[in-house]
Amino acid sequence: KEGKNFIPITQTWPADLETPLSTWLKLSEKDSHGVFLESVEGGESLGRWSVVATKPLWEAVCCGKEIVKTWNNGKTEIHTGDPFDILRTWTKEYKSSMINDLPSIGQLYGSWGYELINKIEPSVPINEIQEKNIPYGSWMFFDQLVVFDQIKRCITAVVYADTSSLKDSSLDEVYLKSISKIQKTRNLMKVPLKEYEFLDWNENENLNLDLKSNWKKKDFEEAVLSAK
């Protein structure tokens, strides 16, 4: 479509012999960086959609005052500023379109800690970040996804073809490359699921943990009384 540079290429097939969990276990076996998301209705009932994604195009991690972007080829970029503004700038580069029969699934997934609430609500006080090497925000941007439709019992593999720097003569090559990625995903899903050993639960096991409180007992008791 005109003005689009991140074109979704899809294939759909029956999901009779697969589940979202089995797919996640197969696709994430050699790449643990990914997401497995389930939609939920009313906070209780399992929803219609499940999304499995591995091998992010790039990852972004906030540490201290920096946000580090790491591409899937190992190249890194270091930026400073508001992480949300930076993420908006990065994602604006990708102009895509909705996919028929699929919800607006997005491609940027991640999590962030309390330290970033100040970027949204400046009046909320936060403590100065002490550990500069501990991430307080982490995101992954995907150009390939697997989407389960629990009602129609079908799987849709999505690969986004980047046409931003291509000429018309190379569009066929990009399309075939996207189809090849989908086929690799399907081949991985055909592999039998390996056996997993479950951990034995021992409720009587005693662990010797070296714990040290960062509160004095007196201060803790006073805080409890104040909360009451």
Task: Enumerate the predicted regions with their spans.
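Active-site metal-coordination/substrate-binding segment of hydrolases
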Residues: 80
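Extended accessory regions or peripheral subdomains of proteins
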Residues: 1-34, 39-77, 114, 118-228
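Conserved phosphate/anionic-ligand binding catalytic regions in large, soluble enzymes, centered on
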Residues: 106-115
